[in-house]
Amino acid sequence: MKCPFCDDPNTQVTDTRENEDGDVVRRRRRCVKCDKRFTTYERVDLKMPHIVKRNGNRSEFDHSKLVGSMSLALRKRPVTTEALEAAVDRIEAKLLSLGENEVASEKVGELVMKELKKLDKVAYIRFASVYRNFADVDEFSELVREVQTRPKRGRPANPQPSGPEHDLFGG
């Protein structure tokens, strides 16, 4: 690897360590020419699928857009940054596991709603009300009733998932 200080291509690895999860390798390096030390990180670079929007346009997956939209729904809610990041990681892992080059934006939206429903019901309702573009108050009220009828201890009201929403995402 080329030295970032003197551009010499001859460097030596002096120390190598993996992070706790085993998905990042940290290497300490020393330049043979100028003797300066620097750190590099290696991680798998997985290609996220392109997103196909409702109008047919395609765009690259944007991690910051996903975090931003979820953060907006979670604004002023008691959810930690770590919990948000874990939810985003699960969404990205699910998208990668599909093995597709392209994914419909509707699928991403449904995955976001599924994660927000687990994190915070108010954030879920906020996101769903914008995402589903409710035509009237009755549709909004129905969503609120659906959330309110579920038990508060984390167990679903209907332990046997049914319907197209659950079939689409395998859960």
Curated annotation (Swiss-Prot):
Cofactor notes: Binds 1 zinc ion.
Disulfide bond residue pairs: none
GO BP, one annotated term: negative regulation of DNA-templated transcription
Cofactor: Zn(2+)
Keywords: ATP-binding, DNA-binding, Metal-binding, Nucleotide-binding, Repressor, Transcription, Transcription regulation, Zinc, Zinc-finger
Pfam families: ATP-cone (PF03477), Zn_ribbon_NrdR (PF22811)
Zinc fingers typed unnamed, residue spans: 3-34
Domain (ATP-cone) ranges: 49-139
Region (Disordered): 1-21, 147-171
Gene Ontology terms, MF aspect: ATP binding; DNA binding; zinc ion binding
Keyword Cytoplasm attributed: no
PANTHER family: TRANSCRIPTIONAL REPRESSOR NRDR
Family indicated by similarity: Belongs to the NrdR family.
Function: Negatively regulates transcription of bacterial ribonucleotide reductase nrd genes and operons by binding to NrdR-boxes.
Protein name: Transcriptional repressor NrdR
Organism (species): Azoarcus sp. (strain BH72)
Highest classification ranks of the organism: Bacteria, Pseudomonadati, Pseudomonadota, Betaproteobacteria, Rhodocyclales
